């Protein structure tokens, strides 16, 4: 459990079986927001050294489908994962280092942007990615999980295994 989140209760509420790999994946994504899959695998292996890549991929897919984890994939980037879900927030991505930070919705509730024409769709979410050039990750208080941001913040990544 991290930051008061009841991962066991979350899995139960979503109708998912409670397994050690799923709990470890949820914990890894919570502790390393915006982490790439390889980083999630390394973090999970700190708790479960023998877990396979496929098990982590399966857990990420199940948790994303259940709405417990959000998958984001900025253009030109690999998929990233976070546990901050259901609040319609957006992201800012640094063009130079790839760091990602959360940006709260500009106005109102989901969707916080209104399309000029809904073309017959019932729009319930707007996803915005802001692109920027960071002076430094520290200046932007970036909470990214990229190796570059970790190096800039002096935070060690789990070893690459």
Curated annotation (Swiss-Prot):
Compartments reported by the entry: Cytoplasm
GO cellular component: cytoplasm
GO MF annotations, alphabetized: DNA-binding transcription factor activity; transcription cis-regulatory region binding; zinc ion binding
GO annotation, biological process: negative regulation of DNA-templated transcription; regulation of secondary metabolite biosynthetic process
Key words of the record: Cytoplasm, DNA-binding, Iron, Metal-binding, Repressor, Transcription, Transcription regulation, Zinc
Pfam family, one: FUR
Binding locations of Zn(2+): 94, 97
Primary localization class, coarse: cytoplasm
InterPro entries, alphabetized: FUR, Fur_C, WH-like_DNA-bd_sf, WH_DNA-bd_sf
UniProt family annotation: Belongs to the Fur family.
Free-text function comment from the UniProt entry: Acts as a global negative controlling element, employing Fe(2+) as a cofactor to bind the operator of the repressed genes.
Protein name per UniProt: Ferric uptake regulation protein 1
């Amino acid at each position: 459990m991290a930051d008061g989140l009841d991962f066991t209760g979350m899995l139960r509420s979503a109708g998912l079986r409670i397994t050690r790999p799923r709990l470890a994946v949820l914990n890894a994504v919570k502790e390393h927001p915006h982490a790439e899959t390889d980083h999630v695998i390394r973090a999970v292996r700190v708790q479960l050294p023998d877990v396979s890549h496929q098990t982590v991929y399966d857990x990420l897919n199940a948790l994303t489908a259940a709405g417990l984890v959000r998958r984001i994939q900025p253009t030109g980037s690999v998929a990233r994962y976070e546990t901050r879900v259901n609040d319609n927030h957006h992201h800012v991505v640094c063009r130079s280092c790839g760091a990602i930070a959360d940006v709260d919705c500009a106005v109102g509730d989901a969707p916080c942007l209104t399309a000029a024409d809904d073309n017959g769709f019932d729009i319930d979410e707007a996803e915005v990615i802001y692109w920027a050039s960071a002076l430094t990750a520290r200046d932007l208080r970036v909470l990214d999980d990229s190796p570059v941001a970790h190096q800039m913040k002096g935070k060690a990544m789990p070893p690459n295994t």
